[in-house]
Amino acid sequence: MRKSPLFVDFSLLKFNRYFRAIFMARMMSVFALGILIVAVPVQIHQLTGSTLQVGMAMALDGVGMFVGLMCGGVLADRYNRRTLILLARGLCGLGFLALALNSFIAEPSVLALYIMSLWDGFFGAMGMTALMAAIPSIVGRENLAAAGALSMLTVRFGAVLAPAVGGIIIASAGVSWNYLLAGIATLGTLIPLARLPSLEPQDYEPAHPLRALLEGFQFLVQNKIVGAVVAVGTLQALLSAIRVLFPALAEDGYNGGAFEVGLMFSAVPLGAMIGAFTSGWVGGLRRPGTVMTGSVVVSSLIVASLGLISHLVVGLAALALLGYLGSIASLLQFTLVQGHTPDRLLGRVNSLWNAQDVVGDALGALGIGALARVTAPLLAVFSFGASATLAGIIMSVGFVSLRQLSGVDALAPLDAPVELVEHESPGF
């Protein structure tokens, strides 16, 4: 059967049993996190009636995630990545079951919710970093685009469906069942993940953790391709913060309310899902760097145009296109970062790359929120998009190595082939 030049290539699931195991675990994990992400803020609000305390829990999750990324990156380049993945997933699952136990008692502890938010953020990020570092050796660098698209498709589907399912569970059975199901599903991911082979990092050199992390940062600065990709990715992360002004855009631009805001929030992931599903052509690009930077520049122009659009349908179409381009840019970032980073640095580079995405989104939200306080929301959106467009053009011109990168160079092997050794375990 010939591969479609348009749609994502599913053959990796058929022929690579290790990636198939990861895909199954990822689907279960996305579902678990989707129903959990609804439960925590709902329960805290029920217990305290305070949006501030809900925000504190979300902030603690973010802090845990950032620290987990930093620690996980160093650990993933030092220890067996399979062990780290299983350990992190198992501890996350136990944390969710602890939340279920806390919710079943007569007076649930808000402090326990705070602690578990930190716990989940830390171990979730640690496991994610180890898993991303293992992907190139499992699928081969030539299959990174397909692996990234399939993973992205899973996340997009989960982001749309799982929170809705979580809300239904809360309404029909109570928040305790969200935690219980999330814990069971997360521990259930250990079944497919236990099938993974031993995933020892290559060429490990003992070093102090801070020095090891610094080495990863130095690689980002010195490598013209990976450093440029991360810089462009930061700009894209800033653009994602436009959602902060969706309520103001709906009111001032479209004379709408909550219904219109909901449509706007749905348009972006819908476009992203279409982008992931129709990304079969990405792996064969002759100039992947140019397409990536071009996608971000056009995305910036779309954000600027939102400050000028006065029709809801046109605005929703623009947001869907924004999601589509963001999906393509993210997939190319994944492929280029994974494809140009040596195995011995994959943990640390992935941790720093994901951290900049988290920080970039937060800074973008803060910046556009502050801009909207001193100007009209529509003007703030236009100014934000125009500034991002200028920055994107400067990057496109300035990052010569990225612009001239060919598809053949993007798939160039950096390490010796990795021999995947079956893990002898009587379990599962």
Show which residues each predicted segment covers:
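Transmembrane alpha-helical cores of Major Facilitator Superfamily
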Residues: 27, 59, 63, 90, ...
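C-terminal transmembrane bundle of multi-pass solute transporters/carriers
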Residues: 57, 66-71, 78, 82-88, ...
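Hydrophobic alpha-helical transmembrane segments
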Residues: 110-121, 125, 146-199, 264-266, ...
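Hydrophobic core of transmembrane alpha-helices in multi-pass small-molecule transporters
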Residues: 27, 95, 108-126, 234, ...
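Juxtamembrane intracellular "pre-TM" segments in multi-pass secondary transporters
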Residues: 1-19, 198-231, 414-428
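Small-residue hotspots at the loop-to-helix junctions and early N-terminal turns
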Residues: 36-39, 43, 48-58, 149, ...
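A single, central transmembrane helix in multi-pass transporters
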Residues: 23, 27, 31, 35-39, ...
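Helix-loop junctions on the cytosolic side of multi-pass membrane transporters
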Residues: 105-106, 133, 137, 179, ...
